[in-house]
Amino acid sequence: MTASRWIVPLLIGLAACGAGVDPAGAQQARQMLNGFRAEQGLGPVTASEALEAAAMAHALDMMRGGFFDHRGSDGSDVMARVRRAGYGACAVAENIARGQGGLAEVMGDWVASPGHRANLAMPQVTDYGLVRAQGDIWVLVLGRDGC
């Protein structure tokens, strides 16, 4: 089953159980990401349901497990999580954050951090997924499928 066929039932199920993860302001996120990338002379990124699913899974894992790390509770890294979500990544990066109350704040913090900024400015990425979980846990996954 492709990510596009199971993402809607997943989102409905999460909403029903009060999981507290919602897509983070899709239009605003796209504008902010692509505005930053344009300032760097880079091409735009497009929202990906599969990358959003991978970001959501990690945000829920951290929220439920009470931890904050790029490694999942099962030892997974971002590449393993995006592949589980059906995305055949050849390039991938992940930014996580905690405590920022809004998209502008989290983006500002990522741009100000050299490592996070480098991820935002990866020239080879073409897609992204961004979610925010309860407790203001943010996960951004950037990738390129099928290089």
Describe every region a protein language model picked out.
Residues A89, A97-C147:
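Disulfide-stabilized extracellular recognition modules
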Residues M1-V8:
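Bacterial N-terminal signal peptides that target proteins for export
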Residues E52-G102, L120:
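Short, surface-exposed glycine/acidic/tryptophan-bearing loops
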Residues E39, G43, F67, D77, ...:
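Extracytoplasmic/cell-surface-exposed regions of Actinobacterial cell-envelope-associated
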Residues C17-A19:
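N-terminal Sec signal peptide cleavage junction
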Residues D22-R64:
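A short alpha-helix/helix-coil micro-patch that ends at or immediately precedes a cysteine
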